[in-house]
C-alpha cells in the first residue's frame, strides 16, 4: 500500500513505530539505571558524612533493593574504599571520596540529561507516527462507512 513514488508504506510506518517503541523502552530502562546510580552515590555520600560526624553506628543495606538492613557498630576510620570505574577501587580519605563521588555523580547526571533529550526526541517522533497511523485508520473507517 504505497502512498506514491518515493512514499513510505503503511507497513514501513508500523515497523518504524514498533522500532521506536522498543527504543523508547530501552532508553527508559537505561534512564532508571542512571537514576539508581545517582541515588546510590547520594547514599554513599551520606554514609561518609555519618562516618565523619563520629557516629559509631549506622544502618547498612545488606542487599541492593533494601530488603535487609543491619546495624553496624564500631564504624571508625578516616579512609574508605571507593569505586573508580570498571574493576578499579581505591582506598582514599573521606574528603577525597566525596570529591570522587561528586565527579562521578556529575558525569552520570550529564549522561542522564543527554539520554533524556534523546528520549524526548524518540517519543516525539513516535507520537507523530502514531498520529499518522490514527489518521490513516480514521480515513479507512470513513471510507468503509461511505461504501
Swiss-Prot record:
KW RNA-binding (keyword) present: no
Disulfide feature: none
UniProt-listed SUPFAM superfamilies: Prefoldin
Database matches in Gene3D superfamilies: 1.10.287.370
Biological process according to GO: protein folding
Pfam family, one: Prefoldin
Record's subcellular location: Cytoplasm
GO cellular component, one term: cytoplasm
Molecular-function GO terms, alphabetical: unfolded protein binding
Top-rank taxon, per record: Archaea
Key words of the record: Chaperone, Cytoplasm
InterPro entries recorded: PFD_alpha_archaea (IPR011599), Prefoldin (IPR009053), Prefoldin_subunit_alpha (IPR004127)
Assembly and binders: Heterohexamer of two alpha and four beta subunits.
Purpose of the protein: Molecular chaperone capable of stabilizing a range of proteins. Seems to fulfill an ATP-independent, HSP70-like function in archaeal de novo protein folding.
Family, per entry: Belongs to the prefoldin alpha subunit family.
Name used for this protein in its record: Prefoldin subunit alpha
Species for this entry: Saccharolobus islandicus (strain Y.N.15.51 / Yellowstone #2)
Amino acid at each position: 500500500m504505497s502512498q506514491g513514488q518515493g512514499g513510505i508504506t503503511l507497513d514501513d510506518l508500523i515497523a518504524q513505530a514498533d522500532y521506536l517503541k522498543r527504543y523508547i523502552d530501552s532508553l527508559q530502562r537505561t534512564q532508571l539505571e542512571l537514576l539508581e546510580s545517582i541515588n546510590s552515590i547520594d547514599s554513599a555520600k551520606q554514609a561518609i558524612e555519618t562516618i565523619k560526624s563520629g557516629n559509631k553506628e549506622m544502618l547498612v543495606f545488606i542487599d541492593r533493593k533494601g530488603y535487609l538492613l543491619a546495624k553496624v557498630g564500631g564504624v571508625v576510620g578516616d579512609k574508605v574504599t571507593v569505586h573508580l570505574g570498571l574493576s578499579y577501587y581505591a582506598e582514599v580519605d573521606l574528603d577525597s571520596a566525596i570529591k570522587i563521588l561528586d565527579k562521578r555523580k556529575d558525569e552520570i547526571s550529564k549522561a542522564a540529561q543527554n539520554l533524556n533529550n534523546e528520549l524526548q526526541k524518540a517519543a516525539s517522533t513516535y507520537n507523530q507516527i502514531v498520529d499518522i497511523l490514527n489518521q490513516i485508520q480514521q480515513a479507512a473507517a470513513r471510507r468503509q462507512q461511505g461504501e
